[in-house]
Amino acid sequence: MAKPITIKDVKTILTQPAGSRLVIVKVITSEPGLYGLGCATFTQRFHAVHAAIEKHLKPFAIGRDVSRIEEFWQMAHVHGYWRNGPVLNNAISGIDQALWDIKGKMANMPVYDLLGGKCREGAAVYRHASGPTPEAVLEKVQKFVEQGVRHIRVQMGGYGGQADSLPKPEGAPAGAYYNPREYTRRQLKMIDYVRSHVGEEVELLHDVHERLQPIDAVRFAK
């Protein structure tokens, strides 16, 4: 029986292109030149993901058979007793992706073929249009439409929306405060304004960026 290829090392690479904090995982194997890459990005808690990989998952992973991906995933998920949460899930995901990358290289096949093959030839993508007013958002949307873009995410007030000028009690911590009802009214007016000018052929998307509680999100959708 051939000797299995094992995990020799796990490296965590922190990088920040264009201001986006990314966590890249590189799994190095016992086979010279064979390695895999995965993404473990949790932008707001990248140091926590880095620690989870370096202090917990890396020692657990070294020496394991790279082909036994599901076994690693299951054991990594439960070996710490407490489980789940975005930090651990991102850390495990980065190594999991890297192991699939290795398996694809070993088979000389793209990973999607190992997972059953493609079912479509392409996927729709979107562009992001934001501005301080509905008119400013519409101006950007129209430029994208002229370029042939058909899926556009619209946001008024910049990334995550515009904070509200709410009266704060004495001692309230500094930060941005959001009135969910006002946010809903403001964004829906903007979306309606843009829709009335671009028609039904353009797909409009909106991301509330966790600004709304579930009940407010239901009202927004209705």
Label for each model-derived stretch:
Residues 1-42:
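Structured beta-strand/loop patches that form or line metal/cofactor-binding pockets in enzymes
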Residues 9-10, 22, 32, 37, ...:
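Ligand-binding pocket scaffold of soluble enzyme catalytic domains
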Residues 31-106:
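Metal- or metallocofactor-binding catalytic centers and their adjacent structured scaffolds
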Residues 98-107, 138, 142-146:
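Alpha-helical scaffold segments that flank or form the walls of functional sites
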Residues 114-120:
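Flexible hinge/switch segments at interdomain interfaces of large molecular machines
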Residues 122-123, 127-222:
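Metal-dependent enolase-superfamily TIM-barrel catalytic cores that perform enediolate-based chemistry
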